[in-house]
Amino acid sequence: MAKGQSLQDPFLNALRRERIPVSIYLVNGIKLQGQIESFDQFVILLKNTVNQMVYKHAISTVVPARPVSHHSGDRPQGDRPQEKSED
């Protein structure tokens, strides 16, 4: 798995598994809504009244309708646990 997808794949997979409705904003400003049916390295299959194949290079933002509980085995680089403050 490529380093850049270590966060992307578990996030999209959690959205797919839990059937969480999403809003997908494209780089041209168009908003698409539906549920993620499937995805691969290059596309997301979005299901609503019809299925749409959306190319990832055209996506700006993926916004879940509710919080997502995605758990990947390792923590992304640069993401450290919060330190407790000692007052």
Curated annotation (Swiss-Prot):
<keyword id="KW-0346">Stress response</keyword>
<dbReference type="GO" id="GO:0005829">
    <property type="term" value="C:cytosol"/>
</dbReference>
<protein>
    <recommendedName>
        <fullName>RNA-binding protein Hfq</fullName>
    </recommendedName>
</protein>
<dbReference type="InterPro" id="IPR010920">
    <property type="entry name" value="LSM_dom_sf"/>
</dbReference>
<comment type="function">
    <text>RNA chaperone that binds small regulatory RNA (sRNAs) and mRNAs to facilitate mRNA translational regulation in response to envelope stress, environmental stress and changes in metabolite concentrations. Also binds with high specificity to tRNAs.</text>
</comment>
<keyword id="KW-0694">RNA-binding</keyword>
<comment type="similarity">
    <text>Belongs to the Hfq family.</text>
</comment>
<dbReference type="Pfam" id="PF17209">
    <property type="entry name" value="Hfq"/>
</dbReference>
<feature type="region of interest" description="Disordered">
    <location>
        <begin position="65"/>
        <end position="87"/>
    </location>
</feature>
<feature type="domain" description="Sm">
    <location>
        <begin position="9"/>
        <end position="68"/>
    </location>
</feature>
<dbReference type="GO" id="GO:0045974">
    <property type="term" value="P:regulation of translation, ncRNA-mediated"/>
</dbReference>
<comment type="subunit">
    <text>Homohexamer.</text>
</comment>
<feature type="compositionally biased region" description="Basic and acidic residues">
    <location>
        <begin position="71"/>
        <end position="87"/>
    </location>
</feature>
<dbReference type="InterPro" id="IPR005001">
    <property type="entry name" value="Hfq"/>
</dbReference>
<dbReference type="GO" id="GO:0043487">
    <property type="term" value="P:regulation of RNA stability"/>
</dbReference>
<dbReference type="GO" id="GO:0003723">
    <property type="term" value="F:RNA binding"/>
</dbReference>
<dbReference type="InterPro" id="IPR047575">
    <property type="entry name" value="Sm"/>
</dbReference>
<dbReference type="GO" id="GO:0006355">
    <property type="term" value="P:regulation of DNA-templated transcription"/>
</dbReference>
